[in-house]
Amino acid sequence: MTTRETTPWTMSGDAKKLMDVALGKTPGDLAVVNATLLNVYTGELLKKQSISVVDKWIAYVGENAQDAIGSETIVIDAAGKTVIPGLIDGHTHLGWMCTIEEYLRYIIPGGTTTIVTETLELYPVGGLDAVQEFLASLEDQPIKFLATAPAMGSISRKAGHMPIQDLKRLL
């Protein structure tokens, strides 16, 4: 019988690193300390909270991140500041409004980290190629984009409908 210091399942290096920072065994890359944290579920403002980050992941949120702070950890004192979770825009239509870059310039400073966008306007105008080009433009952006598939039907006779084979390619 062997004993393990970690969990009985295999973890990738990234997961182990994240867990070690969360447990205070290893310093994180970034620590935000002395923050007021908004709990969006209860509406409470929690005082003197700390957040520890490793790579792009939040590893710890709580009152004391001292064990996750090392000599290389960047520490931000957020006294007098309120920290909120990233916001999700659950319904937008980016295909016709403006460029992605222009939109990002306005929404990132407000705390949006994820956008769900419709693609229904694109197919009737530019077909499958237009939708695929738009989806490609959402890749490698500083925030996460999720996109819906275009509607298969249209109230416009001129626009017609989307063939099932095009929908299958998009899904």
Model-predicted segments: where are they?
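Short glycine-rich, polar/acidic loop-and-turn segments at beta strand-coil junctions
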Residues: 36, 55-57, 65, 92-94, ...
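Residue-level detector of solvent-exposed, low-hydrophobicity positions
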Residues: 44, 95-98, 130
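Solvent-exposed, flexible loop/coil residues
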Residues: 50, 98, 166
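Divalent-metal coordination cores built from histidine and acidic residues
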Residues: 2-22, 26-27, 104-171
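Histidine-rich, glycine-flanked metal-binding segment
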Residues: 8-31, 37-84
